[in-house]
Amino acid sequence: MKEPRRVVVTGLGVVSPLGSDMDTFWKNVTDGVCGIGPITRFDTSQYKAKVAAEVKDFDPAQYLSTNELLRTDLYAQYAIGAAEQAVSESGIVGTLPPDRLGVYFGSGIGGLETVCSGVAKLNEQGPRRVSSLIIPMMIANMAAGLIAIRYDCQNGAMPAVTACATGSNAIGEAVRTIRHGYADAVIAGGSEASIVPLGVAGFVNMRALSTADDPMAASLPFDARRAGFVMGEGAGALVLEELEHARARGAHIYGEISGYGSTCDAYHMTASHPEGDGGRRAIAQALEESGYTGDERLYINAHGTGTPINDACETLAIKGALGQEKGREALVSSTKSMTGHMLGAAGAVEAIVCLKVLQTGIVPPTINLLEPDPECDLNHVAQTAVQAEIDLCLSNSLGFGGHNATLAFRKV
């Protein structure tokens, strides 16, 4: 049996509440900048949740023509923006046949803005006034399809739709596709744009969102004061490539995706398993596949949403997979304290964070972690970034429906 091929990352792209290019994003993440503020997209006077992490500096016209903008939902625009950055940096297009280049790009929800505007038009003007493009604009696979069209990716264009684990599952399944020889390179990631009235109302009414008015007291992962997550939005894109193909063309390599774990709690629609069992198994799978020796220096970019149940369950999962002692030694932070919860984009953006940690040795913080919850007794990087030599990075993603995904990253 052939040895599985190694998969590396040769391009990164981001659209986020902390910046819509890599340099701005990374500076703000490591400086501990909060990307959360009052919602500006609509009047929130009737909503309990009034803050979100909105993308502020994205210009879709930089990536799309006027005609294309009219035919794409905002979530797909974010996806194309991030993908263009990653593909441009990697230089992958033209280095391999189109049928060896694939796309794995997902969204937790899809074109919610399009759905909302379409329903409003239906109610106000009747069925004949509903756009003929509403279906292709709203479906969650269209970002993958549009990216494939843009770069002639004929290997396959698969979306992951696993709620908050979407970005991580898209990357993980892309890794498996390359490892087993079905493709030589894949554009992978996730995107979301659901800060619209329906999205906010739905999450508020299920009591998932923080209702704090102060942006600096809203997203509080692992803090005893935490009371819900803050909605974010944006996209993250990575170009994944077989190691020898990347080396042969002299590509810059950020790091290797050395492990992937994917499990399901099979427990509850929205709540994590109370003992963190599914998350524990996903972490353990990623560690085993990555060849973790037990004495390596770890950084974990936690799912860390800031909900009471999630953070406690994830703590159990981390300690369950690593053991009590090692689980308390690994450096842990949640960048959702700054970006909010980017939902389907979260795993992709947090994978980018892990790769930048390996490259720079700078570990970003969990900001506003002022009262650590004793139940979440991990080695938190609180308030300010730290310099550390890291051997192995993990990124955890836990989604509604019981989806759990962990990615592991190493230097090459």
Where in the sequence are the language-model features?
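ACP-dependent fatty acid/polyketide chain-elongation machinery
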Residues: M1-E68, E244-Y254, I352-T366, R410-V412
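Condensing-enzyme catalytic core mediating Claisen C-C bond formation in acyl metabolism
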Residues: R6-T10, C34-G37, D214-Y292, L298-Y299
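Conserved beta-ketoacyl condensing-enzyme motif
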Residues: V9, T24-W26, T30-T162, S191-V200, ...
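A glycine- and small-aliphatic-rich helix-loop capping segment at beta-alpha/alpha-beta transitions
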Residues: D23-T30, E113-P127, T177-H180, V200-D213, ...
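Active-site-proximal alpha-helical scaffold in enzymes
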Residues: A79-I92, A140-E192, V230-A251, H341-V363, ...
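Short, well-ordered amphipathic alpha-helical segments that serve as non-catalytic structural scaffolds
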Residues: A79-S90, A143, A170, E241-L243, ...
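Glycine-/small-residue-rich "gating" segment that lines the acyl/pantetheine channel
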Residues: E124-S131, G172, R176, E192-A248, ...
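Short glycine/threonine-rich loop-to-helix capping motif typified by GTGT followed
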Residues: Y267-G279, T305-L322, M342-V349
